[in-house]
Amino acid sequence: MKILHLINLQGFGGAERLFIEYLKNSSFQNEILCTSNSLNKNLIPELKNFNIKYANKIASTKIKYPSFLRKYVLTKKIEASKADVTLVWDFVPRLSRKPKNTSLVYYDHGCSWRYPLTNKTLVFFGMLNNAIAISTASKRVMELRFNTTYEPKKVINRLPLKPSEIAKTLHDGNQITLGTASRLVGLKGIGISILCLSELIKLNIKANLIIAGDGEQRNELEELAIHNNVKDYISFIGYQSDMDTFYSEIDIYLSTPVTEPFGLSCIEALARGIPVIYPNIDGQPEAIKDKYCGIGIKPTLPIPEYHKLTNLDINFPYKVYDPISDTLTAPKLISPQDCASSIIEVINNYDIFSQNAIDWSKETTNYNLFIREFEHAIRENQIINHS
């Protein structure tokens, strides 16, 4: 069975990581059609053994098609592949029409929250044979926003990790190391982690924070740390190609975004016995079990209030999914005070939370199960289209 992967490889986030891992473990014949003009530098070593075709380039040259022709060329290139299924990875491509002789399947990794409800978006979701969702939240966002006539198939993220065998303990009960890892952009709400650290220090709790990742808000986050007198307690360590050292140095993982379809970094932390503090929004309650291996917090801090406290923008003018009410709602962030209280609760029961994190991870790190479920969902769509 042949799969054509339609993907933009300019960035390097969760979807791209999953894509690379899938290619290494796939049982299908795979072809890659890249819609960006170049690869992200972090992807080059990972993809050097794969043949990548570029949607905007003429044959194997560096010459690009004129912009007005690209949607026609893309449609033709998809058809020329003669793939059983064309899998669109987490973006809305510009197509001239529905490609013939292939099932068109969209794989959502969280971008469906952010697509503007334009004609381009609605036409694309209308021409799909089906979609694959990363979580129940992702499935419901597509159904609620785009009124899909098909029911997206849920295949949760499972990472190829081996959970730790031994739970972590706090070697120094008086000192706690917090960690967060993501792109340093508005919607990740990293300012909350810094304000939370400030709250803990006010409560005479010895804490420090390690922030992994790079992004456009790094300078502003460093200024926020200075403004709140916590600069000496924070390490900005930048992008890490190997996260093992980061996870080995932290005791509690902080996930403070305004939206998160299914947190991969949270899954990685739990597999290492690290409890997670997270907002009860979108797919996070599916990734982490509340009061068991982490603590979920109801977001109560409005975006304008966050801006007042941090001088940081969220840049997320969309709604988020509330799993309790099964509705789309205005985005908010968790309050630094609630975050600090939850950290104290975890500290007081640390050994139990850590062991539970490892136990919970046995399901979320069963990568063979992910491959089976993912390929079953793809195969099902091929059967639907060609029956």
Please place each PLM-identified region on the residue numbering.
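Conserved donor-binding/catalytic core segment of Leloir-type glycosyltransferases
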Residues: 4, 132, 170-188, 194-197, ...
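A charged, aromatic-enriched C-terminal amphipathic alpha-helix characteristic of glycosyltransferases
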Residues: 321-341, 345-379
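Short hydrophobic beta-strand element within catalytic cores of glycosyltransferases
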Residues: 34, 275-278, 288, 295-296
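A short, active-site helix/loop in glycosyltransferases that binds the activated sugar's phosphate group
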Residues: 128-152
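Aromatic "clamp/platform" in nucleotide-sugar-dependent glycosyltransferases that forms part
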Residues: 239, 258
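A conserved mid-protein helix/loop that constitutes part of the nucleotide-sugar donor-binding site
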Residues: 13-21, 183-199, 216-222
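Short His-centered aromatic/hydrophobic patch
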Residues: 70, 86-93, 108
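N-terminal strand-loop element at the rim of the active site
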Residues: 5-13, 17-65
